[in-house]
Amino acid sequence: MNNLIENRRTFAIISHPDAGKTTLTEKFLLYGGAIQQAGQVKAKGEARRSRSDFMTLEKERGISVSASAMSFAYNESWINLVDTPGHSDFSEDTYRTITAVDSAIMVIDGAKGIESQTKKLFEVCRLRDLPILTFCNKMDRESRDNFEIIDEIQETLTIDVTPMNWPIGSGSDFLGCYDLVNNKINIMDRADRNVRATSIVIDGLNDPVISKYVPNALRKKLLEEIEMVKGLLPSFDHEMFNSGNMTPIWFGSAI
């Protein structure tokens, strides 16, 4: 029992409405092996059956109005995900949830950045010195400059930001991400996004295979931006993260 408790991790997923947190929750469940098919909130038919949006109002409006918890085993840990309501009308449920989790995953829209409800929920997390991980979503749509988003997070929320990965392109040109931690390039699989897919993995920025998947202009831009990231932004500090003073950020698309 002690071993089970030690390996249990509970995350609240917070965001402004429509930033994509329920869709992201579905993908965690999919890649964690808890479900076989993800149900996108904005999709149609079978694909629209979101596991966390189970109330009639939630299904009709495509939003979460109550916190719902989902669990799955991952490696040697037991993961609890709590999908919280983003709309301010239902924020009391979210506030209660935040008091019972180990850390929070803050989802932001790449085109909109920090929005009002995100800021409110972040401040509740800050009152508890809760560690926060950030996911910048919807990179497959037109989005703001990546450095601009990071600057806004740092200035608006007064927290250091350190990228864990970096997007390759954006909008219709979004191809995948460069993993800064493991020095790998992950090229997105554009097949059926409701089922688990295997991305193309390239070893580092100098692997000649990269030219097969990434156009020269995008590769040059990526190299320039990675150099700026390493020169201008802080490295990950575990102590600062645990105290709620630094957030690692990942870029990508929950779809």
What does each of the following model-derived ranges do?
Residues 1-19, 109-255:
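P-loop NTPase catalytic nucleotide-binding module
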